[in-house]
Amino acid sequence: DIRAGTTMKVDVRDGRPFTDIPETGVFSNDNVGHYVYKVAWSHDVSELLMNRTNRRQNKLEFAGCLPANGECRVILSEEWPTGWVVNSPPMQYLSDNRRFIWTSERNGWRNLYLYDMSGKLITPLTQHTTFEVVGVTKVDEAAGVVYYTARSVDNWMKVQLHRVGLDGKGDVRLTDAKYTHAVTISPDSKFIVDVIQTHKDPPVSRLLDD
């Protein structure tokens, strides 16, 4: 509180001390909160949001902490016991700031999931098991669709543009599988500037009607 000149300590480890074995000073590899990433206020400034992981970095929690008392709640978590989880997975809020698109590799492939801020999974947006998503290109809430790129054809270097409904239905590839694509979508989503190329073909810009 700037006016009052007071501070509040946020307990990112939920009461667990940083030195988990006091006699030796050894850190536990398993307790979440050793590393903290992407600290930012929620849209309504009611919570301080963050990603936090354990020292092994095979557990991730997206948490919201109250500024009044520093207590944290887990909104969602990811765990890969024998591997590693991305510390700061891409996410994108929808316009209501109560729903967000979360990127996860929980099934072994990078996919998109729609959550709300209570941590409820509304729906998987993609469920690919033979190729993975690159990232979200645009969310058109008026049309109820998400545009995203993926490595979905014979060569993983050929990035393609897809469209899927916010209900997770109607996934379709929009671009030519012969090329890799760098796309820009117009504000009204009616047109796409598509720069196509291969390792043998130089870049060519095209204007497409969605």
Question: Which residues does each PLM region occupy?
Answer:
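Beta-propeller folds
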Residues: 1-208
